Structure formats: structure tokens, C-alpha cells
């Protein structure tokens, strides 16, 4: 087992990475101080790992309940969030009740948001079961739900007590979900660590084959990088925005097609292709680097052409973005691997990118 620490002073927490961790009672015990625990999971994950988690919690002598939600991005909304509150209130959960998010990014985001809101804040633990959630969404305290007009527009910054990333859970992950997680790994290397990007290029096939050593390194290095960024800029006042490389275009794709049509990581992968194209057009990135990025995204079995939503629709959707200011779209662009720039772009350049990178 490897442990990476997120250094946030009194709110610091560990990220435990390894195989078989869902069954480790000792990893949960230090973070559960109340008399009850509520597991939040979904209809796909509960049959796979719910019993193992409940067995791990049993020796703690706590009252354990489970809320099972429908599976998918399409359910990341108010109605589903209220199912969590319904479960907590039915079980008479109090301020010391610990929520445990067992699932991917949707479950983690909604459980964290429920924890931030219920009785104005209760503790929660992240147990991410997808590669995307292990390398990205479970770390850093971003929680929330989608709105029909924009992704993740309603939420809170609220840190977990711990992240327990069991890479053994990745063996049951569908191929599309695995590729979606690799997209976030690629993003992390591209924005923050050129040497890590080189490693990803050399090992993308090993990641596709789910080789345990490759997965463990990808999760570890991605978490190290994200932990350092979050520690420096917890609430996305500046530096942390670089983690949104590919997300401005990507969120537009998700909202434009309807949540769940493309996986988040698929949209981010394609969004990176689009952002790299725009980076070249603005004279920031060299063509050879753009081609390298496109190639590794394609090798991860991710889409490299965006849907034809139309220029006006893309622009409308990208203006409904957390980075936008006074309606001006801000893009995270690449200067070189490991070096980014947050900037606006002329509409003509964006239109040229859309013409080149969409169907």
C-alpha cells in the first residue's frame, strides 16, 4: 500500500492506494468517530463491493445503512441528491454520522455534496472504484451536481476524511470507463509533469491491459500532483484551474449531447485535442507536441473528434463555465508539456479549432 497525503493543515487527509483496501477495517477505523455510518453507492457497484465494505465496517460496532442510487451521470441531479437526504433522515443520522462514498465520480461528488449540506456538514470518506475517480475526482474536495444548463454548477468545496483507492476494483471496470480514467491521467501529465507524460506514452498499452504495476503508478503520481496543486490552491483561485485542461470544451460536449451520452473522461480526452489545437493556433504550442498528445489520446481508445453541435451552441455552452468571467470564456492551454496558460482566445481561432476538431 502507498499513502499520499493532502496537506491542508487541520483538514489534511491521507490517500491510501493499493489492492484489497476495501476490506481493510484498519483504514476506516481512525476516521469514523460517531455511532453510525451511511454508505452511498449505486446499482452497479453495490453488488460488486457493497458486502466487502459492510464486512470491513462490521467490527467497528457502528450502525451501518446503505443508500443505493441509480447509476450514471444522467442522475447527478437534485432528485437523486434528495434520495441521499431521504436515507439520512430516515436513519436519523446525526452530525457525527460518517458518509462513505462507494463508487465512481458521480457517487463521490454527490456524497460529498450531501455531506457538506446535511446538518451543515458531516464527515465523509471517499472509496473510489473507477480509475477516473481514483486519479482525480475523489481528491481535492470538489463536490456537487449538474444543472441542465451546466455541469457541476451547483456544489461546494468540502474535503473528505480519507480517500481509500482500491486498485483491485479496476478489474471489474468496463473498458470505456477505464479509458475515461486514462484521459485524466494523460491530462495530469500534460499540464504538470513532462516526465510523467513521457511515462504515459510508453505505458498506455499497459494501462489499457490493466497491468497492476502500471495502474498503481498512474494513480500514485496523479494523486501526488493533484494533492500538491490542491494544497497550494484549494478553492481554485488560480493555480488549481490548470486541472481543467480539456474541460472547457469537454463540459460543452457533455451538456450539449446530454449528460451520460459521453463519459466525462471521453469528453475531457476530446477536449484536450481541441485545446491543443487552439494552443497551436495561438502560437503557444508546437505542432509536434500536439501530435504527441493526439496520438496518446487515440491510443487510450478515446474520441479525438467532437460532436457537431455547431459554433453558436459550443460558444453558448462554454460561457456557462465556472472559469468564465463576465461572459468571457477562459481556456486552459498548453505551452509545452508541464506548462500551461489560462487565457481568453479570439472567437475566430475558436471557430477554426471547432472546424478542425469536430465532425
Curated annotation (Swiss-Prot):
Q: List ligand-binding residues for NAD(+).
A: 71-76, 105-109, 129-130, 142, 151
**GO MF annotations, alphabetized:** 3-dehydroquinate synthase activity; metal ion binding; nucleotide binding
| Enzyme class, first EC level, given as a word | lyase
Binding positions for Zn(2+) per the UniProt entry: 184, 247, 264
Any Pfam family from its record, for instance, is: DHQS_C
Q: Which UniProt keywords apply?
A: Amino-acid biosynthesis, Aromatic amino acid biosynthesis, Cobalt, Cytoplasm, Lyase, Metal-binding, NAD, Nucleotide-binding, Zinc
Q: Name one GO biological process term.
A: chorismate biosynthetic process
This protein's pathway: Metabolic intermediate biosynthesis; chorismate biosynthesis; chorismate from D-erythrose 4-phosphate and phosphoenolpyruvate: step 2/7
Show the Gene3D superfamilies listed in the entry.
Answer: 3.40.50.1970, Dehydroquinate synthase-like - alpha domain (1.20.1090.10)
* Cofactor comment text: Binds 1 divalent metal cation per subunit. Can use either Co(2+) or Zn(2+).
Q: What is its EC number?
A: 4.2.3.4
Q: Which family does it belong to?
A: Belongs to the sugar phosphate cyclases superfamily. Dehydroquinate synthase family.
What biological function has been recorded for the protein in this entry?
Answer: Catalyzes the conversion of 3-deoxy-D-arabino-heptulosonate 7-phosphate (DAHP) to dehydroquinate (DHQ).
PANTHER family the UniProt entry points to = 3-DEHYDROQUINATE SYNTHASE, 3-DEHYDROQUINATE SYNTHASE, CHLOROPLASTIC
The record ties this protein, via HAMAP family, to:
DHQ_synthase (MF_00110)
What name goes with this protein?
3-dehydroquinate synthase
Give the organism the record lists: Burkholderia ambifaria (strain ATCC BAA-244 / DSM 16087 / CCUG 44356 / LMG 19182 / AMMD) (Burkholderia cepacia (strain AMMD))
What taxonomic lineage is listed for the species of origin?
A: Bacteria, Pseudomonadati, Pseudomonadota, Betaproteobacteria, Burkholderiales
Amino acid at each position: 500500500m502507498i499513502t499520499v497525503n493532502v496537506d491542508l493543515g487541520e483538514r489534511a487527509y491521507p490517500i491510501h492506494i493499493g489492492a484489497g483496501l476495501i476490506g481493510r477495517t484498519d483504514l476506516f477505523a481512525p476516521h469514523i468517530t460517531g455511532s453510525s455510518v451511511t454508505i452511498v453507492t449505486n446499482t452497479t457497484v453495490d453488488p460488486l463491493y457493497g458486502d466487502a465494505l459492510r464486512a470491513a465496517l462490521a467490527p467497528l460496532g457502528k450502525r451501518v445503512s446503505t443508500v443505493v442510487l441509480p447509476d450514471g451521470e444522467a442522475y447527478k441531479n437534485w432528485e437523486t441528491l434528495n434520495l441521499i437526504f431521504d436515507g439520512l433522515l430516515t436513519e436519523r443520522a446525526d452530525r457525527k454520522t460518517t458518509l462513505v462514498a462507494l463508487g465512481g465520480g458521480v457517487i463521490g461528488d454527490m456524497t460529498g455534496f450531501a455531506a457538506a449540506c446535511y446538518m451543515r456538514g458531516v464527515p465523509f470518506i471517499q472509496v473510489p472504484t473507477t480509475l477516473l475517480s481514483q486519479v482525480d475526482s475523489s481528491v481535492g474536495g470538489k463536490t456537487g451536481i449538474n444543472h441542465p444548463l451546466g455541469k457541476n454548477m451547483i456544489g461546494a468545496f468540502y474535503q473528505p476524511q480519507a480517500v481509500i483507492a482500491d486498485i483491485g476494483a479496476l478489474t471489474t471496470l468496463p473498458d470505456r470507463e477505464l479509458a475515461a480514467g486514462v484521459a485524466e491521467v494523460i491530462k495530469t501529465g500534460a499540464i504538470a509533469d513532462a516526465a510523467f507524460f513521457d511515462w504515459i506514452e510508453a505505458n498506455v498499452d499497459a494501462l489499457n491491459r490493466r497491468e497492476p504495476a502500471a495502474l498503481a503508478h498512474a494513480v500514485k503520481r496523479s494523486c501526488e500532483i493533484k494533492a500538491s496543486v490542491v494544497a497550494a490552491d484549494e478553492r481554485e483561485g488560480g493555480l488549481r484551474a490548470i486541472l481543467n485542461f480539456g474541460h472547457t470544451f469537454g463540459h460543452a460536449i457533455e451538456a450539449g449531447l446530454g449528460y451520460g451520452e459521453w463519459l466525462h473522461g471521453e469528453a475531457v480526452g476530446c477536449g484536450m485535442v481541441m485545446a491543443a489545437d487552439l494552443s497551436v493556433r495561438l502560437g503557444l504550442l508546437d505542432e509536434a507536441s500536439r501530435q504527441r498528445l493526439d496520438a496518446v489520446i487515440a491510443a487510450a481508445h478515446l474520441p479525438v473528434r467532437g460532436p457537431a453541435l455547431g459554433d453558436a451552441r459550443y460558444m453558448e455552452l462554454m460561457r456557462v463555465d465556472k472559469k468564465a468571467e463576465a461572459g468571457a470564456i477562459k481556456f486552459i492551454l498548453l505551452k509545452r508539456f508541464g506548462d500551461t496558460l489560462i487565457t481568453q482566445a479570439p472567437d475566430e481561432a475558436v471557430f477554426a479549432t471547432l472546424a478542425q476538431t469536430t465532425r
